[in-house]
Structures are given as C-alpha cells and as structure tokens.
C-alpha cells in the first residue's frame, strides 16, 4: 500500500480542493439553503472538467457512464463549476459476521481456511470493494492523480463563503482509497480543514481505520481520528487508541494512549499498551514509549523508555524476550538478549546471563553478510565460576570445572566467489573440556560435545575438474580422554585435493588425488617406551592418486558397469615405528564389475501396482599387500550394512586398502503404485569371499573387530526394508544376521506416523552387538547398544497438545533423554511446560551417569517472541522427529 498522500489531505480530493467545490456550492444551484432532504446528491466530473451533479431519490438507481451520471429520476441535473471535486459511494462486500474485518474460521471459504493455522479461530481478511460502476476496486490504483468522487444522501448547507456543512452520511472514493462517515461534515476553506463526525471509516488496501470523528489539517498534512481503532491486514495486527494521527507523507500511524495486539478482537490474550506508539507500515517497524505488557488485562511488565518492535519479519534493535530455566546443575538461569540492528548487512546480539549457582556471564554474537560471504563471530565469558573447586578441578568426572574463568570463542565463515570458488572457516575454542556441558545451551539441549572442529577451506570446481585445500585440527574436549591418548585424531596441516573426469565415447575416465601433512601433539610423559617404539609419535606426509576407467552400459532392463583402477600411495614419515621405512609406498590394482537386471510385472489385484524384481551382482578384486607396517593416520573400519555390499573398499581413508576377491549377491523387490510412488521395498544381500582377508588395522580391538569375520567365506546376511503403510504410516528396518554364530549382529527398526505437523508418533529400536571401545569395559557394564526411542506430538483439540520423548538405554537401564510436556497454542500465543531428565556424558564406558533434571516454561507471544524458555523449541525439534511449531502451514 502506498500512502503517498492521504485521501483527506489530497489536494485533488473533494474536501481538500482549493476552494473549487466551495465556490461551486456558493454560486450554482446548490446556493439554496438546503437541497431536498429526500434525495441523494451524486456528482462526477465530465470530460471538460465540469461537475455533473444530480439529486437522486433514495429509491432510484443510478448508472455511471463515460464520466457523467445518468439519473433515473424526475429531477433535473444541475451542473457545478469546472474544477470542483466530488466522490461516489464505494460499496463494500465482506464476510457475514465480520467485525473490523475479523472473520471467524466458521465463516471462511475453503480457500481462506486453508491459509489459516489449525490453532487459529479466525483472521483479518480484507473484503473486496466495488465502486459506483459496480467494478471491483483495483488494489494497485494509486489514489494520487485518481478522480475524486463523492455521494451523500443528506442536505448540503452553506454558512458563509468559506464554510460548508453537510448533514448526513458522506462517502468518498479516490482510486483504491475510501472514507465514510454517518453524521455530519464541516468544511472550512480558510483554515483548510475538515471535520467529520459519526462512525468514520478510512480504508486503503491493507489498512482499516475507524473512529467516532476525524479532523483533517491539510496545512500540516495530518489526519486525526478520535476514539479510534485500526487494523493492518498485512501484518495481522490491530488495536485501539484515544487518538490516531495518520501522516500523509508516509505510511505512518502515530498513536496516542493506544494498544497493539495480534490476538482475536475482543479476546486479547496479550496487548501492548503505550503512551505513544508509531507504526511505520512501509518499513514494517513499530516503536512504543512507556510500554506495558498485559496478559489477560493484567500488567506483567513495564518499560518506561522507547522500545522498537517489528510489525512483520523485519529486524529491529532492542531487547529480545528473556530466557528463563532451572536445572539441577546450574540452578536458576536467566538471560536477557539485546539485539543491535546495526545495518542491513550486519548486526549483533549482546546477552547478559545470570546462572544462580555459577555467577554472571555475558555473551556476544556479531553477524556480517557480504556480497559473497556469511560471517559470524561468537564470544562468551563467565569470570569466576562459583562451582570451581581448586582441590577437585583436575579430577575427571568432578563437578568442578577445570578453570575458574570460563570462556568460548567461535568464528564461522562461508563464501562463494563466483560460480566456481568457495571458502569456509570454522574455528572454536573453549576454556575447558566441560564448557558445553555446563554452559552451552542453558540446559535445554544435550551438549555432550567431545570434539572441536577447526578448519579452513578453499575450493575450485570446474565442469570437469576440481581442486581444493584445507587445514583442519580437531581438539578433544572430553574430560575422560588424556593428552597422551593414542586415539586423538591427527591434524591436517594442510591437505590438497584434486580430481578430474572426462568422457571418451562410452568410456568414463576419472582421477582423484590428495596430498596431506598429518601432525599430532601427544604428551610424551604419558607414553611408554614401547608405545613410542611402535610409532605412537609418527607423523608425516601422504600422497594418494587414484586413476580409474569405466564403461557404463545402462538401459531400462538393467545395467553393467566394468571398472578398472589403480591406487598409489606414498608416505614421507617422521618418528616412525622402529624397523619401518621412512618413505614407504604402495600401489594396488582394482577391478570391479557391477551388473543388475530389472523385471516388472503388473499385480493382478494391485489397482495399477507394479512389482519389480531386481537381482544385482557386484564382483570386486583388489590386490593384497602387507600393510601392517604402514601408519594409520585417518583409516577406520566402515560399519557393514547393505550399502557396503557395493563399495570398493571396506576402510575409510587411504592408509589401508582392503584386499578383496569377492562377489556380492543382492536381490531387491519394489512395489510401485500407478502414480509412480514407491510404496514398499525389500532388499537382501551377502558377500561371497573367495580368499581370506589379510589387511587389518593397527588397533588391537579394531583388529579383533576386523579379524573376526576375515576367515569366513561369507559375510553376514544384510537386508533392509521400507513399507509405506499409508500416507501417514511409514516403516523402516535393517538387519545384519551372522550365519556362523546364528545371531543378530546389528539391527534397527523405526515406525513413524505423521498425519500433519500436529499429529506425530515415532518409535524406534537399535541394537548392535559389538561396540568399538577404546579402553577396558568396566565390570557390570554392558557394552552392547540396545536403545529404544519413543517420541510424539498429539493434539487434544485445536489448541491443546501433548508432547514428549523417552530415549532409553536397555543395556544399562538408564534414561538417556526423557521429557514430557503440555502445550496450549492459538494464533496469539503459545504456552509450554516441560519436565526433563537427561545425561550429558552418555559414553558407555562411564560407571556413573551425570544426570540432570529440570522443569522449563515457555511463553511465546506471536509477533513479540519468546517471553521465557526460548530454547525449548530447539529441544523439541531435536528430540521429536518432524516437530514444528504449532500452526505452521508449510
């Protein structure tokens, strides 16, 4: 909407014309003391600019044609002087029962109801409006420059040459702008003002203003409405005020002693009351001075100064809603963020925070958006943590942090230079290992972080080749891992990657490679001579190049893809193991043949369903070479599953390349509906080994995990299943069956129901027999994974719903994360109450769990933000698959 000039202040409007209408009223047929009380005056300018006015009986009908009014009445048409101004009646068509354009859901059309969240009982819907000609008013019709028309059924009286009074209702139209009143209108030419009384209504697209009276001061370009109310349809807000002043030079409402709310009219859950309020509808920003927040008409918060707030999604400087919580670990936790909208492309947030059992903390975040990058800098400082205990600070598992002063620094950067260059930086540092567990998220989300990523990347990608470089350091912040632990990962200082692809007819050529410098700083004091002799301190460079050629042949009935490749690796080592080479290298050939067929059949009673049968064979041969004396910088055993049947290596990284002479047998069947949707899938497969596997990792435990199946001639039987029971129900499952031991090695199952965003039910179970542990298993602790996870959201009605999660470790009889809560929500506010029990350190080798409990409350006022406990939303979205805020229509 464009309020370049108010209707009431426009120089071409009837009321504010520079004397033209007043002169015509004084010198034409209207000079008689009053017009007939039984008629209706309707005027419109003709092609020459003269006004054609007629007195119409109220029972008569009139038609507008080509700039003149044709009256089906017995009276003559009087002509006003050229240059005078007039208006026509603007008919309004709205929904039955609508009050100030608020339409209850029951009275909406199906199309309107589809755009309203389920928890809302109605919405502000702007009615369609028609002019005198019966045509719907064009919302884009600019009032400035549009002809001004008016109509009145009342009497027009002239007191003096400068003053005119109109008794009765007056309706004015100028473009898409209309104004009406019911009682009387006084025009003062000398003062250039107009006074209207009796049910004044002012409309433009997206704006409705009503009041008991209005005063227009053209000299100051202001329109004043008394005892007023307003509706801004675009933002879904409304309110009332003793006075509203509309400034014609901009889309601004100045409100005195007014209210602001997004709730249902007459049933406001919350309102903002203010001495003075300014709503800039063009910018989407409001400001209020002397603000009182009222909940159900009870004042709960007062701010005596000026506070900005958004009308929509705009960013505005000012205090954000506070966050309030309480946990057994930190006590009462209160944070009050202050947002600084410094410029359109950068901003900052400063958050003072008080933790009852720890002390005062301050955090800051600065965000900068450049033409080619997004950048964020975050910092936090808690000086003098009151839970610090010097006597126990160095004891693993102690409640005391390792340091008295706690801090955090983080930098994130993501850039895109043109279409081919990209950059990324991620840097984090903390004062101690328990920082995130104690302070990371106010107790509302699990923060058991054990690693900090520090990396920077620069990449270039062309259509047929790529190159990149990165540096990476992973810091361990696990209090149970020492600085001499051999499982501390290596740093990449730096790493270069490259690759290219090319097509020659049907042949596909590809090469990938990398060069990495691996470095690691271990505490020598914690290492034994045997460990150092075995290469615990080894570091160095590694070059890996992998050319490959393939000839894919694909068709509707199947495919066959033969591939041949060579993998060459060279190391340059320092402090390598005793008796090993300083510059070893390795070159291994590879051949694979991947093939599959697709059979289809129509199901006799399948209502258009098609069933497929898809056998697949994957043969892999990889040369064997003794690699036991090579370092393991980044290699690890990949967990075996159905997808692993078709991989060319059972290890990740390039320090180990698995030897193989094997054939993978797989069979899948799919059920596809007539619309092409996959409704079910079942796959099963196994690897047949023609030779024993020799290559293993160095870790004794990982060697045991690897060697366990290496002498068998068959792998475990693996399968996966998917079944779409209906549009709402979905079942997924996978299984790994050990034929030799006749037991399940690993399995998982999940069943999910989602009718919509407000009807969610998830249940899952995960089992794994062998877990990779880097230390002895304590007596009485079951290292197997046996976990169930149940979560859901279920509404009791359109406003109330239950939500919760139960994540349980059956191996050791403990809750990993359990919460239950209730929520009330409408289109005005959301209230949540959640009780939670969780553990931060859920590593399986811990004898004692660090259990936390808490009760959290959240009140969200739509349009104002979270009044308390804002982190609950993240906790729910992390814990309940598919969770969304109540009422979202996405």
Please name every model-derived segment.
Residues 8, 15, 65, 76-79, ...:
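General helical structural elements
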Residues 97-101, 105-111, 116-130, 155, ...:
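Outer-membrane beta-barrel proteins and related beta-barrel translocases across Gram-negative bacteria
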């Amino acid at each position: 909407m464009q309020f370049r000039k108010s209707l009431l202040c426009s120089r071409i409007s009837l009321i504010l014309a520079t004397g033209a209408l007043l002169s015509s009223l004084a010198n034409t047929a209207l000079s008689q003391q009053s017009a007939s009380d039984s008629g209706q005056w309707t005027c419109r300018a003709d092609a020459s600019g003269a006004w054609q006015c007629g007195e119409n009986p109220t029972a008569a009908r009139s038609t507008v044609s080509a700039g003149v009014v044709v009256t089906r009445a017995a009276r003559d048409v009087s002509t006003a002087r050229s240059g005078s101004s007039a208006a026509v009646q603007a008919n309004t068509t709205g929904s039955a029962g609508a009050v100030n354009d608020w339409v209850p859901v029951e009275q909406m059309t199906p199309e309107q109801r589809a755009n309203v969240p389920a928890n809302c009982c109605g919405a502000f819907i702007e009615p369609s409006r028609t002019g005198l000609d019966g045509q719907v008013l064009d919302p884009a019709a600019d009032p400035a420059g549009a002809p001004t028309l008016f109509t009145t059924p009342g009497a027009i009286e002239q007191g003096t040459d400068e003053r005119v009074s109109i008794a009765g209702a007056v309706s004015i139209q100028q473009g898409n702008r209309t104004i009406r009143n019911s009682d009387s209108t006084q025009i003062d030419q000398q003062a250039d003002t107009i006074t209207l009384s009796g049910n004044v209504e002012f409309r433009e697209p997206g704006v409705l203003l009503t009041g008991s009276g209005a005063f227009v001061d053209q000299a100051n370009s202001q329109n004043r409405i008394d005892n007023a109310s307003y509706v801004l349809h675009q933002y879904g807000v409304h309110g009332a005020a003793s006075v509203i002043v509309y400034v014609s030079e901009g889309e601004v409402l100045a409100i005195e002693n007014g209210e602001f709310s997004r709730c249902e009219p007459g049933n406001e859950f919350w309102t903002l009351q203010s001495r003075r309020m300014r709503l800039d509808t063009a910018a989407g920003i409001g400001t209020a001075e002397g603000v009182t927040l009222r909940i159900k008409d009870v004042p709960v918060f007062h701010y005596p100064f000026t506070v900005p707030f958004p009308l929509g999604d705009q960013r505005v400087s000012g205090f954000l809603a506070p966050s309030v919580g309480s946990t057994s670990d930190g006590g009462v936790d209160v944070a009050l963020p202050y947002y600084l909208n410094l410029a359109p492309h950068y901003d900052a947030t400063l958050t003072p925070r008080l933790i009852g059992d720890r002390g005062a903390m301050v955090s800051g975040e600065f965000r900068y958006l450049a033409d080619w990058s997004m950048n964020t800098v975050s910092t936090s400082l808690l000086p003098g943590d009151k839970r610090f205990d010097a006597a126990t600070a160095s004891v693993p598992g102690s409640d005391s942090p390792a340091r008295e002063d706690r801090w955090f620094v983080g930098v994130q950067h993501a850039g895109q230079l043109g279409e081919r260059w990209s950059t990324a930086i991620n840097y984090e540092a903390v004062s101690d290992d328990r920082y995130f567990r104690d302070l990371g998220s106010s107790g509302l989300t699990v923060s058991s972080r054990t690693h900090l990523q520090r990396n920077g990347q620069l990449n270039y990608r062309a259509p047929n080749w790529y190159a990149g470089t990165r540096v990476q350091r992973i810091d361990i912040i696990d209090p149970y891992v020492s600085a001499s632990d051999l499982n501390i990962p290596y740093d990449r200082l730096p790493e270069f990657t490259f690759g290219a692809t090319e097509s020659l007819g049907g042949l596909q050529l590809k090469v990938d490679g990398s060069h990495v410098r691996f470095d690691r700083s271990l505490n020598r004091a914690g290492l034994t001579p045997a460990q150092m002799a075995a290469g615990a301190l080894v570091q160095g460079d590694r070059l890996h190049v992998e050319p490959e050629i393939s000839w894919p042949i694909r068709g509707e009935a199947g495919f066959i893809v033969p591939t041949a490749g060579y993998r060459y690796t060279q190391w340059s080592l320092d402090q390598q193991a005793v008796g090993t080479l300083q510059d070893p290298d390795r070159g291994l050939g590879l051949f694979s043949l991947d093939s599959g067929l697709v059979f289809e059949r129509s199901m006799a009673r399948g209502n258009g369903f098609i069933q497929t049968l898809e056998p697949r064979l994957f043969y892999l041969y990889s040369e064997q070479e003794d690699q036991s004396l090579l370092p393991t910088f980044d290699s690890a055993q990949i967990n075996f599953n159905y997808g692993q049947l078709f991989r060319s290596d059972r290890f990740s990284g390039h320090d180990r390349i698995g030897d193989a002479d094997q054939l993978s047998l797989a069979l899948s069947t799919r059920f596809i509906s007539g619309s092409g949707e996959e409704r079910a899938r079942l796959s099963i497969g196994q690897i047949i080994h023609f030779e024993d596997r020799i290559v293993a990792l160095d870790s004794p435990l990982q060697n045991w995990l690897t060697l366990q199946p290496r002498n068998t001639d068959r792998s475990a039987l693996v399968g996966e299943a998917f079944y779409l029971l209906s549009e709402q129900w979905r079942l997924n499952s996978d299984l790994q069956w050990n034929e030799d031991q006749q037991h399940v090695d690993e399995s998982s199952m999940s069943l999910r129901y989602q009718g919509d965003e407000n009807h969610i039910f998830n249940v899952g179970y995960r089992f794994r027999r062998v877990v990779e542990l880097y230390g002895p298993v304590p007596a009485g602790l079951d290292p197997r994974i046996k976990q169930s996870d149940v979560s859901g959201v279920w509404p009791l009605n359109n406003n109330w719903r239950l939500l919760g999660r139960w994540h349980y470790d059956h191996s050791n009889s403990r809750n990993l994360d359990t919460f239950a809560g209730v929520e009330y929500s409408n289109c005005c506010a959301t209230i949540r109450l959640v009780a939670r029990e969780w553990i931060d350190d859920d590593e399986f080798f811990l004898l004692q769990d660090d259990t936390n409990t808490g009760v959290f409350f959240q009140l969200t006022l739509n349009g104002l933000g979270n009044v308390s406990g804002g982190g609950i939303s993240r906790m729910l979205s992390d814990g309940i698959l598919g969770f969304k805020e109540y009422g979202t229509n996405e």
